[in-house]
Every structure is written in C-alpha cells, then in structure tokens.
Amino acid sequence: MKIHEYQGKEIFKKHNIATPNGIPAFTVEEALEAYNSLKSDIVAVKAQIHAGGRGKGGGVKIAKNKDEAEKHIKNIFGMNLITHQTGEEGKKVERLYLEGGIDIKSEFYTAITLDRSKEMDVFMVSTEGGVEIEKVASETPEKIIKIW
C-alpha cells in the first residue's frame, strides 16, 4: 500500500504527533482556496506522487506570498514530474499538498517500506530528515534505524 505525504501526516495527527498545518487539493481552484485557508505568510506547495525526489525534480516550491503561491500551484499541478524514482516517464501531478510555514526545531524521516532482499516490511527512522535520505543511506547508513 502506498500513501501520499498528506495521508501520512493525517495519521500522525490522529496519534498526536506534531505536524504543520496542511491541506490537500485535487484541483488548481482547491489549491488556491487552501492557500487562503492556511493564513500563513510562507506556504510550501508540494506535488503528491508516489516517488521520492519531488523537491529536486521541481515538485516542491516555497511561496512567500499569494502571487508566488498561485504561480507554483499552476506550474506544479498537472506537470509531469520526473525524479530519480519515477524514471524518464515521470508521473503526472494530480494532487497537491499545501502546508503552512513553520520554524523547524527538528526534523525526522520515517517510512515503512518493503525490503525486497528480506521479503518483508521494514520500519525506518532517521534524525537526518528526508530530503536526501538516499544520500544518508549510502554515506552514513548508521544514521538510519531499521526494524523488521
């Protein structure tokens, strides 16, 4: 089962894990309404596809005002997002997640994924955040805790 970032954050909120305020959007119009609802000076506009590397591929942008938010929403929604995990064919962005800006004290990476070599699920946690988790895995694997 694959879930999007916004779905994972909904699960976190149900279990009282602090997460930034965010709103999923399935159309450009919904995304613009979400921006207005967040009432935050800074908003992250995030493509929701089942692949990592969204930021490096241009699918995550920070908007510092309404004009920037509108530009990013219109550019990202419907784009064919190509990342190191999608391959050359990429994936069409059909949903966005808008998240209000916050001051980050600490950031963690968590994932439940399939370990194909062991043919079982693995729960992974790291204090190194998730922006370049593949780099962390290859250069400092001891910073990722795995539980099978």
Where are these regions (language model features)?
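Non-catalytic terminal accessory/regulatory regions of metabolic enzymes
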Residues: 29, 38, 68, 76-82, ...
